[in-house]
UniProtKB/Swiss-Prot annotation:
GO biological process: microtubule depolymerization; microtubule-based movement
Annotated source species: Cylindrotheca fusiformis
Family: Belongs to the TRAFAC class myosin-kinesin ATPase superfamily. Kinesin family. MCAK/KIF2 subfamily.
Function: Involved in anaphase spindle elongation.
This protein's GO CC annotations: cytoplasm; microtubule
Composition skew (Basic and acidic residues), residue ranges: 17-33, 42-54
Protein's recorded name: Diatom spindle kinesin-1
Region span, Globular: 1-85
């Protein structure tokens, strides 16, 4: 009996001990859970404060990605340390200068919670692309860098850009009677037209000042026209259509284009303003007032005999677009986009050939490069200012813009064949005189005031910048992370490795499917681009044939009138009536032939247009 009681007592003590251990483990788990919740609330509060701080700084968006970008920038600043900043002045030995300008974050981007994803340091520009790992939670950044001649951040002034990119071109045109061209290139809405307007504002006073110092026997005339869907339109004379012709000597002439005298800087700016007011713009996905044409301002320096003594081109290129961005457009918008991208591709090849000092420059690739043929001569100078949008949603567009500029820059560097100290020794900088700097500073006062107002408008904090939407998005994001953390607490010890394997396999299959889908979409877009280009060419042929028919009919109408008058006189012999019938039959045959040619062109155009619309529908379905 005593032995039984002892066994029962021992068993009771063992059970009690196990209960105490279980209770202690539960209490420990509860304590850890409270600690996690406390830490989570602290992190939530810290993220909220960081989110509000970013909004006040004019940079809303994902707190984690913004933090990663800022951390990366601090590391870069530490690496740079006390290194001297790059010079703002251009070198004299290069025929090609490539620069990039980053604009400030816009109100529209703030409302979309779009954070700043572009950084500029020491003539290099980085694009930070936000990514998620396979788990769909862990965030990280990828960095794409590009080394260019000059990089300008959102705080750069128009004066700095002018000194680095355009000032040496003015010296080249005035001193050597040469040719020079400034291009502004980039995604629609990235600030091309704004940058070009600032350059023109300063150029107006700097060019006239340099001419006054060097010579007094030259006068300035200006031609301002746009290239829209393959048509040359004179912006200074009611958008009259001009013809692009090439004579037997290879000289390109724009018939019907008139030059306007500009005796003073004020007259020059008035001409520029008039031209900009008539430029073709349309609404696109990226910009409500996107420039859909290449605006070309040509400044001619002529002596009093009319002989050309220098030429400077200011080209504001149309906004570049990818094929997938035009899937919702009608045929006219798609034709515009195809023509824009074709001309930009041809322009890149011409500038590369110029940088390589190639014997052949493919300027016949588009009407844009054909117009600028004389600017691609070996002794000409070219500057390209690539503009990029800082928003994360535009990262792909910014990458394409910088790759375009980098291809040109890469070819120029390799063609020079100079590296290290040898290259630096030949890069003699252009240092303008004190009087010229003062003149430029005075000229930029108005432009800089506009720039400052623009920056303040873009960077100022608004009381109602989608505050409710921001708070909702932030709370939703934090709640999702909290739910993920809690789910991880309860499931971290019961994860199944087979499930992970199957998840990885599903992910790989999804990636492969997405790749195949992307390849199919790219092929469809390429076919659509070729078809749109064919539609554009057939449209041009149809219009030319129609015009030829009208002219031929007018000539025949005059001849028919004379023939009819000769018959109506009366007293005609049988032979004369027979000749009348023969000539009338010839007129009818000619008219029938003209109608047949025009009808054939029309049928071919309509057939190709129907094919273009069908391909556009297929590409749209492929995108989704």
């Amino acid at each position: 009996m005593n032995a039984a009681n002892r066994r029962k007592s021992t068993s009771t003590v063992g059970i009690t001990g196990r209960k105490d251990a279980t209770r202690m483990k539960i209490e420990q788990m509860e304590k850890e859970r409270k600690e996690r919740r406390k830490t989570m609330m602290q992190r939530k509060e810290a993220r909220k404060q960081e989110h509000m701080k970013n909004i006040e700084a004019g940079n809303p968006g994902d707190v984690d990605f913004i933090g990663l970008v800022e951390e990366w920038r601090r590391e870069q600043e530490n690496k740079i340390g006390d290194k001297s900043p790059p010079s703002l002045f251009a070198s004299t030995n290069s025929n090609i200068c490539i620069a990039v300008r980053k604009r400030p974050i816009s109100d529209k981007e703030r409302q979309k919670l779009d954070h700043d994803s572009v950084s500029c340091f020491q003539n290099k520009v980085w694009i930070h692309s936000a990514k998620l790992k396979v788990d769909g939670i862990t965030k990280y950044l990828t960095h794409n860098s590009f080394q260019l001649d000059h990089t300008f951040g959102e705080d750069s002034t128009t004066e700095q850009i002018y000194l680095a990119t355009t000032l040496p071109l003015v010296d080249h045109v005035v001193s050597t009677q040469g040719r020079a061209t400034v291009f502004c290139y980039g995604q629609t809405g990235s600030g091309k037209t704004y940058t070009m307007n600032g350059i023109q504002q300063i150029l107006a006073y700097d060019l006239y000042g340099q001419l006054a110092e060097h010579t007094d026997d030259l006068e300035i005339t200006v031609a301002f026209f746009e290239l829209y869907s393959g048509n040359v339109l004179d912006l200074l004379h009611g958008c009259q259509r001009c013809k692009l012709l090439e004579d037997g000597n290879g000289e390109v002439n724009i018939t019907g284009l008139r030059e306007v005298p500009a005796p003073t800087p004020e007259a020059f700016l008035q001409v520029i303003e008039e031209g900009h007011s008539l430029r073709t713009t349309q609404k696109t996905e990226a910009n409500d007032a996107s420039s859909r044409s290449h605006a070309i301002c040509q400044v001619f320096l002529r002596d009093y005999g009319g002989n050309l003594r220098g030429k400077l081109g200011l080209v504001d290129l149309a906004g570049s677009e990818r094929g997938s961005d035009t899937k919702q457009h009608n045929s006219q918008r798609r034709t515009e986009s195809a023509d824009i991208n074709t001309s930009l591709l041809a322009l890149k090849e011409c500038i590369r050939a110029l940088g390589q000092k190639s014997a052949h420059v493919p300027y016949r690739g588009s009407k844009l490069t054909l117009i600028l043929k004389d600017c691609f001569s070996p002794d000409s100078k070219t500057t390209m200012v690539a503009t990029v949008s800082p928003g994360a949603s535009a990262a792909d567009h910014s990458l394409n813009t910088l790759r375009y500029a980098d291809r040109i820059k890469e070819q120029r560097v390799s063609s020079n064949g100079q590296r290290g100290k040898a290259a630096k020794a030949s890069n003699r900088e252009i240092m303008p005189s004190k009087e010229r700097l003062m003149r430029i500073a005075a000229a930029t006062e108005q432009a800089d005031d506009q720039h400052s107002a623009f920056v303040q408008k873009m960077l100022a904090e608004h009381d109602q910048v989608q505050a409710d939407a921001n708070d909702y998005a932030f709370t939703e994001q934090v709640d999702e992370e909290e739910a993920d953390d809690e789910e991880g607490d309860y499931e971290e010890e019961s994860e199944d490795l087979d499930y992970e394997d199957s998840e990885g396999q599903d992910y790989e299959e999804a990636v492969e499917s997405q790749y195949d889908h992307s390849q199919e979409a790219q092929e469809g877009e390429e076919e659509l681009r070729r078809t749109v280009q064919a539609v554009f060419e057939l449209e041009e042929a149809l219009l030319n044939q129609h015009m030829s028919n009208i002219q031929a009919n007018a000539e025949m109408l005059t001849q028919e009138g004379k023939l009819l008058q000769s018959v109506q006189a009366g007293g005609l012999s049988e032979d004369e009536m027979h000749n009348y019938a023969i000539q009338l039959a010839e007129f009818l045959d000619k008219k029938e032939s003209l109608i047949y040619k025009l009808q054939s062109k029309l049928d071919e155009f309509q057939e190709q247009l129907a094919r273009e619309q069908e391909l556009a529908r297929q590409v749209q379905l492929t995108q989704y």
